Each structure stands twice: as structure tokens, then as C-alpha cells.
Swiss-Prot record:
Name under which the protein is recorded: Endoribonuclease YbeY
Cofactor(s) needed for function: Zn(2+)
Biological process terms in GO annotation: rRNA processing
Alphabetic keyword roster: Cytoplasm, Endonuclease, Hydrolase, Metal-binding, Nuclease, Ribosome biogenesis, rRNA processing, Zinc
Length: 171
């Protein structure tokens, strides 16, 4: 596994214990980093880069979404890169923050007929790619990012989350 310095903050009841989340996220993000390094030639710093993960609730993520994106609604995941980086280029020593809302993850997992862990895995990979400069603001970007997500998730034994769907671009 690629080395990452993962910091976790649990701001809401209902999430697993910190040790459990850290092991789960380490496995998911480590596998994503290895795939990107080995298959996509993504460079990483020699020292393990830091990723901050915040596990919160819908109310908190709605406030953050309103403040930083001008969207006054809850969302599943928000990512805030510490430094601007282009996809495939060397990131800084601090990758940034990924914030995930428990209620939205639970609701979406139920609607998608997936386990909570499988959906959380997808959202962690999605957020991690944002920290590395990937985006889905237009169809070309979405195709690249969603392709990476699908290949990383396949390495983790999960199916294509976009199968049968149009590209998920967000304005």
C-alpha cells in the first residue's frame, strides 16, 4: 500500500469508532494511491502526504456547502485540496480535506441498494481524486474521473458505480 498520513475527525454520532474508520479509510485510500501510482503514473511526495477526513452530519455539511460553494443543501462528500494541483502532477505534502455526511451516505446507499461501506468506499475514492486535481465539471473531465473511480473500485472488488447512468457532471 502507498503510505498516507490520514487524520480523522468524527463530528457526529453514528459513525464507527475512530480506530475502525482509520483502518477502513487507510485500506481504501491506500489502494487508490497504489493504483494511481502504479497504473496511472501519479507521482506522490517521498514523505507520506497528509489527508484529513471529517465524518459529520447533514446539517454540518450543508453549512459548509453553503459557505464554500453557495449551495444551501446537504451533499454526500466535499473535498478541499490544500494546494492547487493538476491531475497527474506532483501534489504537495498536505493533500487536503474530505468531508462526508453520514445521513446522506446512508440514504444514498439505501436508494442505490448498496451497502453503506461500499458507498462510503466510492465517496472516499471520489473525494481523494478531487484532492489530486480531478474534477467532473464537463463531460471530458467526468469521463476521466469516473473511469478512474471505476478502475480503483474494481481493484477493491466493487462494481462500476456509474453503470447504466449518464455522466454525473456538476455545474
Amino acid at each position: 500500500m502507498a503510505e498516507l498520513d490520514i487524520q480523522i475527525s468524527i463530528e457526529n454520532i453514528g459513525w464507527p469508532e475512530e480506530e475502525t474508520l482509520l483502518a477502513f479509510c487507510g485500506r481504501v485510500l491506500g489502494a487508490a494511491a497504489v493504483y494511481l501510482r502504479d497504473s496511472e503514473k501519479q507521482p506522490f511526495p517521498t514523505m507520506p502526504p497528509e489527508v484529513s477526513l471529517v465524518f459529520t452530519d447533514d446539517a454540518s455539511i450543508q453549512d459548509i456547502n453553503a459557505e464554500w460553494r453557495g449551495k444551501d443543501k446537504a451533499t454526500n462528500v466535499l473535498s478541499f485540496p490544500a494546494f492547487p494541483v493538476q491531475p497527474g502532477k506532483m501534489p504537495g505534502p498536505m493533500l487536503g480535506d474530505i468531508i462526508i455526511a453520514r445521513e446522506t451516505v446512508e440514504r444514498e446507499a439505501h436508494e442505490l441498494e448498496k451497502s453503506f461501506d461500499d458507498h462510503l468506499t466510492h465517496l472516499l475514492v471520489h473525494g481523494f481524486l478531487h484532492l489530486l486535481g480531478y474534477d467532473h465539471m464537463n463531460s471530458a473531465e467526468a469521463e476521466i474521473m469516473e473511469g478512474l473511480e471505476t478502475r480503483i473500485l474494481a481493484q477493491l472488488g466493487l462494481s462500476d458505480p456509474y453503470e447504466g447512468q449518464d455522466l454525473k457532471m456538476e455545474p
